[in-house]
Regions:
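Alpha-helical transmembrane segments of multi-pass membrane proteins
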Residues: 1-231, 243-249, 258-261, 273, ...
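Well-ordered alpha-helical segments embedded in enzymatic catalytic cores
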Residues: 274-281, 347, 351
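Conserved segment of the thioredoxin-like fold in thiol-based oxidoreductases
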Residues: 336-337
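Short alpha-helix immediately C-terminal to the canonical SAM-binding loop
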Residues: 325-327
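A short loop-to-beta-strand scaffold at the N-terminal edge of the catalytic core in hydrolase folds
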Residues: 235-240
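Conserved SAM-binding loop and adjacent beta-strand
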Residues: 264-276
Length: 360
């Protein structure tokens, strides 16, 4: 493993770059949404940061006449701290910018720059430094550069799939940030030569700081958002459950990105969105409609209303996000064991195309 520690570092740096890019949309989405404009801002800023990192990383590499690998170790150590600051920067800057600036594009660009600019810049610097460290023979510069670039790209491909399919829906953004920071910390230790007792003490202190910053970010988030009682990352979106009180009532809401999807009156248990009761008109126009289909469940406020009002009718709900169903059970009182309710966890369009219960 020691023989390939530079290659491992380059691969993982490429992977972490894409992990950060993917979680950037999850961090920004509750404040500015996740539209094409927001993704454009995120990708543009991160590519800008990376291009600066490649350039300055090359300059640092050329100044490293002795090919001291400790320089790369120090870079990774700094990157670990910069990455661990992401949860704090989300609350301090992104939340503040979203409150006081109306232009979503400006908020997205500034937020991506402040929160992800430095980690992206530092991670990009890894490749040119690694190229210099591997180049003991001028005749092999091309092959070495190609190998390092290939490893970084393969790492980015791996990071894209691993983050999108596994990390985000199962761990959540804050845990992923902590994991990325600790991984960078481990790589920093792995690369450093001539480790002393003093060095190990310093690295232990850094680990404590990394963990503390992560928890501090979570604490500040709760202080600044006391209404949010649940913050969940699913395969499809970031979901907030909040409790909001007015002079008359207390409501529990479900928010996806910047949009309010569902809410209930906590005192009565009734759905808060009165317009949903217009769905009951189906019974006025067709008294024989006993098997109903609803595309999209969210917090299942209407299906629960339906089941209570029409005890002899059945409803099928197609909800693509299984986390929505879980949250509705935990926070909104959905009873998935009701024999008159059937839930399909799939895309609504696919369901309509392929189900055999469709009636025309």
């Amino acid at each position: 493993m020691k023989k390939y520690k530079l290659e491992i570092t380059v691969f993982l740096s490429g992977a972490l770059t894409m992990v950060l890019e993917l979680i950037a949309s999850r961090i920004l989405s509750p404040y500015v949404g996740s539209s094409n404009l927001i993704w454009t801002s995120i990708i543009g800023i991160m590519l800008t940061s990376m291009s600066i990192g490649y350039w300055l990383g090359g300059k640092v590499a050329d100044k490293n006449k002795e090919n001291d690998i400790n320089i790369l170790s120090n870079y990774l150590s700094i990157t670990a701290i910069a990455t661990s600051l992401i949860p704090i920067l989300e609350v301090v800057f992104v939340n503040t910018l979203a409150k006081y600036l109306e232009q979503l594009i400006i908020v997205a660009i500034l937020s991506a720059t402040i929160v992800f600019g430095i980690p992206s810049f530092l991670l990009a610097a890894v490749s040119p430094i690694a190229v210099k460290l591997k180049n003991s023979n001028i005749d092999n510069v091309g092959a070495t550069s190609g190998k390092i670039s290939s490893l970084s790209t393969i790492g980015s491909i791996f990071g894209t799939f691993f983050a999108g399919f596994i990390l985000i829906p199962n761990l959540g953004v804050r845990n992923i940030v902590l994991g990325c920071s600790i991984l960078l910390w481990i790589l920093s230790i792995m690369l450093l030569k001539n480790k002393t007792k003093k060095y190990y003490i310093l690295m232990l202190v850094e680990l404590i700081v990394i963990i503390a910053l992560n928890f501090l970010g979570g604490y500040i988030f709760k202080i600044n958002n006391p209404d949010i009682i649940k913050d969940v990352d699913s395969e499809y979106s970031r979901i907030w459950v909040t409790e909001v009180a007015t002079e008359q009532n207390k409501y529990k809401t479900l928010q996806v990105d910047t949009g309010l999807e569902s809410y209930i009156n906590q005192e009565t248990g009734e759905m808060g969105a009165e317009y949903l009761k217009y769905y009951d008109l189906f019974d006025y126009y067709n008294k024989n409609a006993n098997d109903i289909l609803m595309i999209g469940g969210a917090a299942y406020t209407y299906p629960m209303h339906f089941l209570e009002k029409y005890e002899n009718k059945k409803i099928d709900v197609v909800e693509i996000d299984s986390k929505m169903t879980e949250i509705s059970e935990q926070e909104f009182g959905l009873d998935t064991t009701n024999p008159n309710l059937k839930i399909y966890t799939t895309d609504g369009r696919s369901f309509l195309n392929y189900n055999d219960k469709k009636k025309v």
